[in-house]
């Protein structure tokens, strides 16, 4: 009966927002010769290469609103689908912190050409490369072409302390701190200088990606970006989470619980820095019985969510105002696709006009929840993420269709063992021991997935 109802479900056609006129992008011609390239409007580029955005999304009949779609993202069993394994590389940053790069396919599985497009992924709040929403994109993107995939390489940037990455300094991560993705991209571009780098971020990671792209401007090493379920205006969206009883008691507390558990796992590591304000704040947040996201951020993130300056912030609301990405969106200078659902219970304020930025295509579905977009498959009980379709189409379009762009990329050099960008000495990274093989479906037990 449920399958029959699903057949009657109204198709949700995304609303697409472009600046008028949209930017023109340089696309490849019949050959890779620069002489064969031509200019095409971003709107035409998306329309011709991302048909799923125009064909629509049909939500599974039993996941008919944003709360149910979001809940299924958390409690659904995705261990049997989208299996992705990785090789992990650990990077040490100048402040002593550690970030983890998980690369797929593993080197013992197959070898890819050096110019293979690379999908650089930023995960959500307390996620990592194991998250089902990450694997839902990387599985089709990194499956060999002869098996129906794109044949790309995927590299997930796991934030400090997430997905088993150790905490080695009294600094965490946040929605606004971009230096870790900056050095990660620096490392990836140095290792694969011939490969086009395509950025995609989910939720908090989408916010970080948007800010990074905006800050880099014409010097960006990524040739395109995609933001999925980005929280954009952190002040307004956090305020709505606080003001509504249901959102506060379910979503704000669930996210805070994840962060609280994550801090508990690293309390011993942080104890090695007894005089740091972050370490001193940990016992209070660990003892809290009813913690919301804003209370956690007011105690922990506004102190240790990034380097100084601008951290620490007086309150979480000062941090939210600084870290928001909605106003930064106007400064992005690479082709950029944003996808949000109107019924997302966590993200309810969407900057669809993108500050008039002609490089942005902003797609909004009526349904889908937060990192959900589940639709019924061909058989009863088969549920898949619709959002994988337009995202993979976008990755194929920008990875294979764009011609080389004129960008002002700064050269790199190695100073005292750290890879740095010439002219900038405050950030850098180097590989350190650790890492190994990572099985994506195993995940990080004890934390709610999908947030």
Spans of features found by a protein language model:
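Alpha/beta-hydrolase-fold enzymes
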Residues: 3-31, 192-308
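N-terminal cap/lid segment of alpha/beta-hydrolase-fold proteins
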Residues: 62-114
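Short, surface-exposed "cap/lid" segments of acyl-processing enzymes
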Residues: 93, 98, 102-168, 187, ...
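Alpha/beta-hydrolase active-site loop
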Residues: 170-192
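Active-site nucleophile elbow and catalytic-triad environment of alpha/beta-hydrolase enzymes
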Residues: 302, 308-328
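Short beta-strand/loop motif that positions the catalytic acidic residue
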Residues: 332, 338-340, 344
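Catalytic histidine neighborhood in serine/cysteine hydrolases
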Residues: 357-373
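Catalytic active-site module of serine/aspartate enzymes centered on a nucleophile-bearing elbow/loop
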Residues: 368, 372-450
